[in-house]
């Protein structure tokens, strides 16, 4: 099916989720969507910015192209005021969630992987934690320089650690 504005528009057509569904989302799927949404709703106001949408979609296992994100961003700014609430997010994600259920990495799996690296559970992976995890999980002893390079590449905000959002971005590359 072709849409005049490109493939990402499947998310934005009015009522498309209803037409595309072969089945309704199960409670587990809705719970996973809500959990992922809340993870990115940093100020807990019930909205995420269109800028966070790409990261959130990656958390859900869908790897949008830059073109899709650009199209979604343009549409969200025009149609949804630049912010997405949970209901809009469910409508955006339902077709993809149903189409790509097989083989997806869900938020729980991503969080479990993060916890393997975040030894002290403070929500941040430090250089020392990464070095220990690499040795424990992969049997690889990386040099301090190699560990620093990995963290530097993933550390978007420059605080010297890798938080969950940065971990998701790193894992989706």
Curated annotation (Swiss-Prot):
One of its GO terms (cellular component) is cytosol. Residues 28-63, 82-99, 105-140, 142-173 form the EF-hand domain. Keywords: Calcium, Cytoplasm, Metal-binding, Repeat. GO terms for molecular function: calcium ion binding. The keyword Repeat applies. CDD domains: EFh (cd00051). Disulfide bonds: none annotated. InterPro entries: CaBP1/2/4/5 (IPR043582), EF-hand-dom_pair (IPR011992), EF_Hand_1_Ca_BS (IPR018247), EF_hand_dom (IPR002048). Ca(2+) 1 binds at residues 41, 43, 45, 52. Gene3D superfamilies: EF-hand (1.10.238.10). It holds the Pfam family EF-hand_7. Interacts with CACNA1C (via C-terminal CDB motif) in a calcium-dependent manner. Interacts with STXBP1. Interacts with MYO6. This is Calcium-binding protein 5. It comes from Mus musculus.
